[in-house]
Amino acid sequence: YDAGKPEVMFVIQRILESDGKFTLLDNNEIINPHPAFRLFATSNTIGQSDNLGIYHGTNQINQGQMDRWNIVATLNYLPHSQEVEIVKAKVDSYNTEEGEKIISAMVDVASLTRSGFMNGDISTVMSPRTVITWAENSQIFGDTAFGFRATFLNKCDEMERALIAEYYQRCMGEELPESAASAAVV
C-alpha cells in the first residue's frame, strides 16, 4: 500500500470513506460497494515510508489516509515450527527426518538474522521467502553452504558477512570461508 502512487491513493481514499461510493466522472456513474466489500492492503513501513533504504520506493502515507483504515494489524514472523512446515511444503525433497533437521536449522539462521537486524547489528534480514529459496538452491547445488552464500550471504554488506557467517556456523555446525574464525586462520 505504501508503494502506491499518490493519484492511486486518493482514489482508494474515496473508497475507504464510510459510504464507500466511487464516482466515475467520465461515465457519470456512481458505484456503490457490495455490503460484503472489504479492502485489504499490506504496508511494510506502516505508512511511515523508509529512510533506511530497505523498502525503496515506498511513500509516506498522509494521516488522512491512515485514519480511514478501521483496522491495522501487525504481522510478525511465524513461530519456528510453522515456518519449518511451510518450507517443507514448498520444497518437498526435505520431507524426511534429516530434511526437517536441516530446514529447522535454516529457520534458526533466519531467526538470528532477524534478531541481528532488530538489534542493529546487520542491515539485511532473511524472510521466509529467502529460506525457501535457500532450501531450493541447496537442493539444486547439492550444497547447503553454497546455497546459503548464493541465496543470502552474497546480498549482504561485506562488513557484516563475518557475523552472518557466524550465525550460519552456530546453527548449521559448519564454518564458512567468510567467518571471522576462518579469516583468522588464513
Language-model segment annotations:
Residues Y1-V186:
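C-terminal regulatory/interaction module of P-loop NTP-utilizing enzymes
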